[in-house]
């Protein structure tokens, strides 16, 4: 076991996702069963007391890997010496709110957090943005951390990836473990493109195994893209445990690598691959090794896939222009 704890900062720590996330981190599921962690919980002042209550519960769980818990309402202090940052807290869209208002409100959160990460985080900092709009929030934070390599900022599409695996497995009547090489392209929004044309199921492509293009276009893609809204409708609250689980998966894969013969999905700064403008934080098929994500290259895209990817990338470019116009990047 490593003797030096890894500092993990979680923002929005008193929220539902934070509550579902923190106990799994403390149990070793984020980084591995031999890596101790010190948790740093960041909240807005009015939620600090609730976060302190969660800290008490974490202490009471007596996790062998938990080296300590600290609660902050100041970003500079919360990110000091941090190795892994999970940016969960964000301003949700409320009824009647325009997209510009949403982006502006979140800019007020992610700009100072990016600055705090830039000034105080550890040299090996890795950042995962969970709070929506995740891709553009990640872009805002990354822009304000110019001394941190851009590749250290990612946004979460692993929840969409996991949802796509689950839907395909359900359709084919196979365990989720048999599904490999699913891809989520583009934005973590309703325009995302869940791609099963390169997926593998028992030696066949996902699309070939399904054998029903109408189901793919009219049921599978919309069901995955709009699953969050479906859960709100059924549960009466947004998905929290599944989002926390996906965040765990994302960071664990980033640190420990993807299995041989498989890849995952993550929103990372584009290097121009697949025609996605450089610098946009877009979801790609990625492998992880040595603590770095790499975009899977050389995948052939048919006209259907190209159109879907381009539509989502257009939305990302529009969001980038909107935050640029607001002076946030």
From Swiss-Prot:
The gene is mdh. NCBIfam families: MalateDH-SF1, PRK05442.1. The active site is at 188 (proton acceptor). One of its GO terms (biological process) is malate metabolic process. It catalyses: (S)-malate + NAD(+) = oxaloacetate + NADH + H(+). The keyword Oxidoreductase applies. Its EC number is 1.1.1.37. It comes from Frankia alni (strain DSM 45986 / CECT 9034 / ACN14a). Keywords: NAD, Oxidoreductase, Tricarboxylic acid cycle. Substrate binds at residues 93, 99, 132, 163. Catalyzes the reversible oxidation of malate to oxaloacetate. The keyword NAD applies. NAD(+) binds at residues 12-18, 106, 113, 130-132. This is Malate dehydrogenase. Disulfide bonds: none annotated. Belongs to the LDH/MDH superfamily. MDH type 2 family. GO terms for molecular function: L-malate dehydrogenase (NAD+) activity. It is an enzyme of class 1 (oxidoreductase).
């Amino acid at each position: 076991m490593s003797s030096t704890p890894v500092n993990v900062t979680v923002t929005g720590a008193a929220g539902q996702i934070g509550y579902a996330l923190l106990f799994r981190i403390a149990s070793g599921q984020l980084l591995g069963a031999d890596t101790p962690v010190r948790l740093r919980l960041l909240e807005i002042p009015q939620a600090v007391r609730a976060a302190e209550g969660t800290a008490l519960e974490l202490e009471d769980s007596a996790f062998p890997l938990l080296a300590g818990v600290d609660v902050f309402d100041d970003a500079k202090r919360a990110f000091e010496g941090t190795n892994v940052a999970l940016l969960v807290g964000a301003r949700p869209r409320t009824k009647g709110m325009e997209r510009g208002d949403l982006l502006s409100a979140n800019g007020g959160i992610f700009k100072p957090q990016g600055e705090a990460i830039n000034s105080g985080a550890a040299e090996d900092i890795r950042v995962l943005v969970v709070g929506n709009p995740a891709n553009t929030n990640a872009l805002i934070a990354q822009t304000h951390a110019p001394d941190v390599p851009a590749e250290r900022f990612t946004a979460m599409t692993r929840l969409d990836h996991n949802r796509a695996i689950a839907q395909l497995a359900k359709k084919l009547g196979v365990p989720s473990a048999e599904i490999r090489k699913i891809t989520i392209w583009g934005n973590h929004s309703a325009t995302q493109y869940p791609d099963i044309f390169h997926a593998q199921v028992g030696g066949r492509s996902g699309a070939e195994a399904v054998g029903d293009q109408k189901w793919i276009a009219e049921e599978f893609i919309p069901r995955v893209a709009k699953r969050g809204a479906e859960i709100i409708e059924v549960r009466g609250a947004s998905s929290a445990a599944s989002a926390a689980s996906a965040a765990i998966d994302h960071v664990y894969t980033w640190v420990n690598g993807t299995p041989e013969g498989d890849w995952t999905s993550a929103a990372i700064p584009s290097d121009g691959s697949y025609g996605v403008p450089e610098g946009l934080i877009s979801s790609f098929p990625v492998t992880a090794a040595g603590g770095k994500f790499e975009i899977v290259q050389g995948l052939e895209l048919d006209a259907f896939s190209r159109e879907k990817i381009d539509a989502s990338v257009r939305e990302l470019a529009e969001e980038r222009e909107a935050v640029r116009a607001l002076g946030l990047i």
